[in-house]
């Protein structure tokens, strides 16, 4: 059983994924962390040097490697759903949960984090709103389950996922 968590930056994918993995005794992985560990540089640096297109190529290669594993919880990068190939990989190898998160929550959570290349030197609220508009339908298309995270802690969201997995497999 593989559980894949998608959603925008600031939705809590990594936090929720770690809790779900612990509850279900599965290994936890994060695509962004894997990319940083394999390259030895930050996502921010990759964006600066290779641009978003270069990063997306690395992201797809990493996803191919990760979906070949079994019994994992995988937190993905916010833009993983942009590529149709990625959406197909996710759908074919596990159950996909979309963490639907209100814009104000994303703004609040990402305001403390300076390692968000897409927000660098921009108005974060406008960028996040634009990303939400362009990606929301892709998240929905890619997902088996949509989890509303509004006014919920990471533990509450994780518990919803665990219940769904236990009830529906």
Question: PLM features: what roles do these ranges have?
Answer:
Residues 19, 23, 69, 133-169:
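NTP-dependent small-molecule kinase module
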Residues 11:
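ATP-binding Walker
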């Amino acid at each position: 059983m593989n559980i894949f968590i998608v959603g925008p930056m600031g939705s809590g994918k990594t936090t929720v994924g770690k809790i779900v993995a612990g509850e279900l005794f599965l290994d936890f992985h994060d695509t962004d962390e894997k990319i940083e560990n394999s390259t030895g540089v930050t996502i921010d640096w990759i964006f600066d040097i290779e641009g978003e297109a270069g990063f997306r190529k690395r992201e797809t290669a990493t996803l191919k490697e990760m979906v070949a594993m079994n019994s994992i919880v995988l937190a993905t990068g916010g833009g993983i759903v942009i590529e149709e190939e990625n959406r197909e990989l996710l759908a074919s190898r596990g159950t996909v949960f979309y963490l639907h998160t209100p814009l104000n929550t994303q703004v609040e959570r990402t305001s403390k984090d300076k390692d968000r290349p897409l927000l660098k030197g921009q108005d974060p609220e406008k960028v996040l709103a634009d990303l939400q508009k362009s990606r929301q339908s892709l998240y929905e298309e890619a997902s088996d389950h949509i989890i509303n995270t509004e006014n919920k802690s990471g533990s509450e969201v994780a518990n919803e996922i665990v219940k769904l997995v236990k009830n529906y497999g």
